[in-house]
Amino acid sequence: MDYFPIFCQLQHKACLLVGGGEIAERKARLLLDAGALVTVNACEFAPQFHHWADQGQLSLISGEFVPELLADKWLVIAATDQLSVNALVYQSANQQRIFCNVVDDPKRTSFIMPSIIDRSPIMIAVSSGGKAPVLARLLREKLEALLPQHLGQLAQLAGNLRQRVKQHFTVMTERRRFWEKLLTHDRLAQSLANNDHVQADQHVEQLFSAPLTDRGEVVLVGAGPGDAGLLTLKGLQQIQQADVVVYDRLVSDEVMNLVRRDAERIFVGKQSGHHCVPQEQINQILLQQAQSGKRVVRLKGGDPFIFGRGGEELEELAGYGIPFSVVPGITAASGCSAYSGIPLTHRDHAQSVRLVTGHAKKEGQLDWANLAAEKQTLVFYMGLSQAGEIQQQLIQHGMPATTQVALVENGTSRHQRVVSGELSQLALLSQQVSSPSLIIVGSVVSLREKLNWFSSRHHDDQPKVTECVAHVG
């Protein structure tokens, strides 16, 4: 360990900053955020320093650095572009046993300033010891994305409750269980994120009055269309906190690799014509796991409320009083169209978009006349087996046979493949792809050649329609 990690209490402590430029300005912000009494020494000062001085937030001393400026200082930072000045600051501070940081000079530094994630009072520091500051910054950015903004409020709330918890729960195991419930309470977290402190206080009171026996919950999470990079931050947080993850065939391996390692995984994959697990049994799995006190994530491809039967599953849970919440995902229509270079709406082509299931209930009848109207884009989910019917009905109800269509197979993944042609060829084209595939119908498909960015970048095989038709024939 090259450096001993330590957090300093600088509230009302005198600190010296040598330098008046842009880098010094960044260091000054950090010192001011920490509540330090900051004195800045430089020959020239950036405008922000004068603003701070006018506001009484810090003091300015104009002129060359002299060692006497270190009197009564707790620490000093040298942030000038003159090596000789920085060296003098370090040497003088060292002689007086004052911690000194010289920016970008590890050899003349007695302490380093790491990359920080500030969720006060939670503070996280990342340092490479000056060896790879860019790597430290990249790690900080990843952590910044993972940690919710309300984390500091949650920590502050926990601190305010410590004494009350000690008095209310005399047994240590009960205290631990209470803290676990409070710190993983989704609705409390959401209230804090919304700055709704009244609602947050209500959730806290419910936790104090509720029995400490484990009570599970279900979080319905949309995994997106395939590319793990399209999983939302909140979705990622949920799958990394889950005790159990119930997932289906449309959830990519890349997304599943992000699930908490010790979480139980239950596969309930479904596909057209073959249900590995009946929907009623899936409902029972969710119910039983939640009733046993587990934190359950129901992970669905795309968005769970768009042809994902998420509403049906939650209705079942609601009937038994099981707490639940929903994390939306990027639906296949949005992901597949974007990764195929096909805008769903365009001022010159389509003023509306319709999402249509290819597997409605048998008694359901689509309004084909409206679907065949001009100036709109149609996106059919689970429509491969019905491609012939879709082609026939749309043409029969007035849509031109030359209308452009595209079929997107394994959209947004590295295995994505797109075939395109005319509506009159849809049935034949459907034989060139396999499930999961999405059907897009509308003149916006004609923009694909111009806007296709993903397949050209990944060198995907993109067979032409003429090749598909010739192959089928």
Curated annotation (Swiss-Prot):
Catalysed reactions, semicolon-separated: uroporphyrinogen III + 2 S-adenosyl-L-methionine = precorrin-2 + 2 S-adenosyl-L-homocysteine + H(+); precorrin-2 + NAD(+) = sirohydrochlorin + NADH + 2 H(+); siroheme + 2 H(+) = sirohydrochlorin + Fe(2+)
Residues at the catalytic site: 248, 270
Matches recorded under SUPFAM superfamilies: NAD(P)-binding Rossmann-fold domains (SSF51735), Siroheme synthase middle domains-like (SSF75615), Tetrapyrrole methylase (SSF53790)
Alphabetized UniProt keyword annotations: Cobalamin biosynthesis, Lyase, Methyltransferase, Multifunctional enzyme, NAD, Oxidoreductase, Phosphoprotein, Porphyrin biosynthesis, S-adenosyl-L-methionine, Transferase
GO terms, biological process: cobalamin biosynthetic process; methylation; siroheme biosynthetic process
Region of interest: Uroporphyrinogen-III C-methyltransferase: 216-473
The keyword Transcription regulation is annotated on this UniProt entry: no
Region (Precorrin-2 dehydrogenase /sirohydrochlorin ferrochelatase) location: 1-204
Pathway: Cofactor biosynthesis; adenosylcobalamin biosynthesis; precorrin-2 from uroporphyrinogen III: step 1/1; Cofactor biosynthesis; adenosylcobalamin biosynthesis; sirohydrochlorin from precorrin-2: step 1/1; Porphyrin-containing compound metabolism; siroheme biosynthesis; precorrin-2 from uroporphyrinogen III: step 1/1; Porphyrin-containing compound metabolism; siroheme biosynthesis; siroheme from sirohydrochlorin: step 1/1
EC code: 2.1.1.107, 1.3.1.76, 4.99.1.4
Official protein name in the record: Siroheme synthase 1
Lineage, broadest ranks: Bacteria, Pseudomonadati, Pseudomonadota, Gammaproteobacteria, Enterobacterales
